[in-house]
UniProtKB/Swiss-Prot annotation:
This is Large ribosomal subunit protein uL23. GO terms for cellular component: ribonucleoprotein complex; ribosome. GO terms for biological process: translation. Belongs to the universal ribosomal protein uL23 family. Part of the 50S ribosomal subunit. Contacts protein L29, and trigger factor when it is bound to the ribosome. It comes from Leptospira interrogans serogroup Icterohaemorrhagiae serovar Lai (strain 56601). One of the early assembly proteins it binds 23S rRNA. One of the proteins that surrounds the polypeptide exit tunnel on the outside of the ribosome. Forms the main docking site for trigger factor binding to the ribosome.
Protein backbone atom coordinates (compact mmCIF):
# COMPACT_ATOMS: atom_id res chain seq x y z
CA UNK A 1 0.00 0.00 0.00
CA UNK A 2 1.24 3.47 -0.87
CA UNK A 3 1.93 5.63 2.19
CA UNK A 4 0.10 8.59 0.60
CA UNK A 5 -3.12 6.53 0.63
CA UNK A 6 -3.00 5.60 4.33
CA UNK A 7 -4.17 8.91 5.86
CA UNK A 8 -7.54 9.88 4.38
CA UNK A 9 -8.94 12.89 6.28
CA UNK A 10 -8.60 14.58 9.66
CA UNK A 11 -11.59 14.11 11.95
CA UNK A 12 -12.80 17.47 13.22
CA UNK A 13 -15.08 17.08 16.22
CA UNK A 14 -15.28 18.83 19.56
CA UNK A 15 -13.56 15.92 21.29
CA UNK A 16 -10.72 15.72 18.75
CA UNK A 17 -10.15 19.48 18.99
CA UNK A 18 -9.95 19.16 22.79
CA UNK A 19 -7.31 16.42 22.45
CA UNK A 20 -5.19 18.76 20.34
CA UNK A 21 -5.47 21.80 22.61
CA UNK A 22 -5.39 20.13 26.04
CA UNK A 23 -2.13 18.36 25.26
CA UNK A 24 -0.56 21.53 23.87
CA UNK A 25 -1.51 23.52 26.97
CA UNK A 26 -0.27 20.90 29.44
CA UNK A 27 1.80 22.25 32.33
CA UNK A 28 3.55 18.95 33.06
CA UNK A 29 7.04 18.00 31.88
CA UNK A 30 6.17 16.58 28.44
CA UNK A 31 3.55 18.11 26.20
CA UNK A 32 1.56 15.46 24.37
CA UNK A 33 -0.57 16.44 21.39
CA UNK A 34 -3.09 13.99 19.89
CA UNK A 35 -4.45 14.20 16.35
CA UNK A 36 -7.45 12.17 15.17
CA UNK A 37 -7.51 11.04 11.53
CA UNK A 38 -9.54 8.72 9.35
CA UNK A 39 -7.25 6.07 7.84
CA UNK A 40 -7.49 3.30 5.25
CA UNK A 41 -9.31 0.23 6.55
CA UNK A 42 -6.32 -2.05 5.79
CA UNK A 43 -3.72 0.19 7.49
CA UNK A 44 -2.06 -1.00 10.69
CA UNK A 45 -0.25 0.98 13.41
CA UNK A 46 3.23 0.72 11.90
CA UNK A 47 1.97 1.77 8.46
CA UNK A 48 0.21 4.81 9.97
CA UNK A 49 3.38 5.76 11.87
CA UNK A 50 5.48 5.50 8.69
CA UNK A 51 2.95 7.62 6.77
CA UNK A 52 3.17 10.41 9.36
CA UNK A 53 6.97 10.26 9.22
CA UNK A 54 7.01 10.54 5.43
CA UNK A 55 4.22 13.07 4.83
CA UNK A 56 4.53 15.41 7.82
CA UNK A 57 8.22 14.82 8.74
CA UNK A 58 7.24 14.21 12.39
CA UNK A 59 7.64 10.93 14.29
CA UNK A 60 4.63 9.89 16.40
CA UNK A 61 5.25 8.43 19.84
CA UNK A 62 2.17 6.19 19.76
CA UNK A 63 -0.78 5.26 17.56
CA UNK A 64 -4.17 4.02 18.80
CA UNK A 65 -6.59 2.51 16.27
CA UNK A 66 -10.36 1.99 16.40
CA UNK A 67 -12.45 0.16 13.78
CA UNK A 68 -16.05 1.25 13.25
CA UNK A 69 -18.52 -1.11 11.63
CA UNK A 70 -20.79 0.33 8.95
CA UNK A 71 -24.41 0.76 9.90
CA UNK A 72 -27.40 -0.56 7.98
CA UNK A 73 -29.41 2.42 6.73
CA UNK A 74 -32.46 2.67 4.51
CA UNK A 75 -32.10 4.18 1.07
CA UNK A 76 -35.26 4.47 -1.04
CA UNK A 77 -36.97 1.99 1.26
CA UNK A 78 -34.23 -0.60 0.70
CA UNK A 79 -31.61 -1.54 3.30
CA UNK A 80 -28.12 -0.42 2.36
CA UNK A 81 -24.88 -0.80 4.30
CA UNK A 82 -22.47 2.02 4.99
CA UNK A 83 -18.82 0.99 4.72
CA UNK A 84 -16.62 0.04 7.67
CA UNK A 85 -13.99 2.66 8.53
CA UNK A 86 -10.97 3.05 10.77
CA UNK A 87 -9.94 5.92 13.03
CA UNK A 88 -6.43 6.52 14.37
CA UNK A 89 -5.47 8.72 17.32
CA UNK A 90 -1.83 9.68 16.83
CA UNK A 91 0.13 11.00 19.82
CA UNK A 92 3.14 13.30 19.53
CA UNK A 93 5.44 14.28 22.38
CA UNK A 94 7.03 17.71 22.94
CA UNK A 95 4.16 19.61 21.33
CA UNK A 96 4.80 18.76 17.67
CA UNK A 97 2.17 20.43 15.49
CA UNK A 98 0.75 19.43 12.11
CA UNK A 99 -1.03 21.65 9.61
CA UNK A 100 -3.33 19.40 7.57
CA UNK A 101 -4.41 22.25 5.27
CA UNK A 102 -0.83 22.96 4.18
CA UNK A 103 -0.04 19.30 3.41
CA UNK A 104 -3.23 18.67 1.40
Amino acid sequence: MNLQDVILTPIVTEKSQDLETIGANSKKGTRMVKYTVKVHIDANKTLIKEAFKKIFKVTPSSVNVQVYRGKIKRFRNMPAARPHWKKAIVTFRDGASIDFAKEA
